[in-house]
Amino acid sequence: MEIIKKTDSFVKKLPRKTTSFSARNWEEKQVIDKKLIKSMFEAGLHRGDLTQNWNPKMAPYIRGEFKGKHVINLVQTLLYLEEVCAFLEKEALKGKKFLFVGTQTHSSVVVKKTAIRTNSFFVNEKWLGGMLTNWKTAKRLVRRLNFLLMLEKTTYIQKLSKKERNDFKKEKNKLKKYFLGLRSMQKLPGVVILASQNQEMNALKECQRLKIPSVTILDTNSDPTLSDYFIPGNDDSYKSLNFLFKFFRLAIKKGRNKRQQLTIN
């Protein structure tokens, strides 16, 4: 609880800016911010990596140390969460498509769940090199997967020999591992959201090469200069990621609802 008390004093110094979480007045916003920071603490977002693994570029976002690990400044987490959500809402309003990437055990479920609920794309098992930079080839493999899944629903499988059925299943499962969440993706996404910088570095590098805006969760061993938009926070916990991705989902839906209203009017 000591960390929360120290953090509460920082809330009074938050800049008065309009964000996706803006309230009717500054006093009301202070109350909301304090509640959010407490919720972030309960979700474990303040828990950084081992101090010996830290990246000095993350110093502005670190509050201190505790039992050999860095403690992330949750006021910074809140401010950057607001900025990211405003960006996602704006991009959704423009009609941009989103790709969620998280291939670790604790991030896989969060990424898939958020992508499905926002009608977005996802990669949650393994990132295949060239998935974006060599999209022409990747797209052919996506089509192949769709074709195999279609055949699976017919009587075609019954006509195959045991070996042919095994080969069919092996190819289908291999393609599902890489492309299941990309089955409806016809072109490159407008924004890529990464559950972790270090764990999803290959995907991040492809975004940089293609100049696709990226949103990344940064732990204390990450490099903030590599990401277009980022949020300092614990990237090693399902609970922490689920907390942040819930706000991503709401921001995207808010932007799309605004776009729909503009279309109707």
UniProtKB/Swiss-Prot annotation:
Subcellular location as annotated: Plastid, Chloroplast
Primary subcellular site in the record, as a coarse category: plastid
Entry keywords, A to Z: Chloroplast, Plastid, Ribonucleoprotein, Ribosomal protein
MF (Gene Ontology): structural constituent of ribosome
KW Cell cycle (keyword) present: no
Pfam families membership: Ribosomal_S2
SUPFAM superfamilies: Ribosomal protein S2
One GO CC term on file: chloroplast
UniProt record, GO biological process: translation
NCBIfam families: rpsB_bact
Family: Belongs to the universal ribosomal protein uS2 family.
Name of protein: Small ribosomal subunit protein uS2c
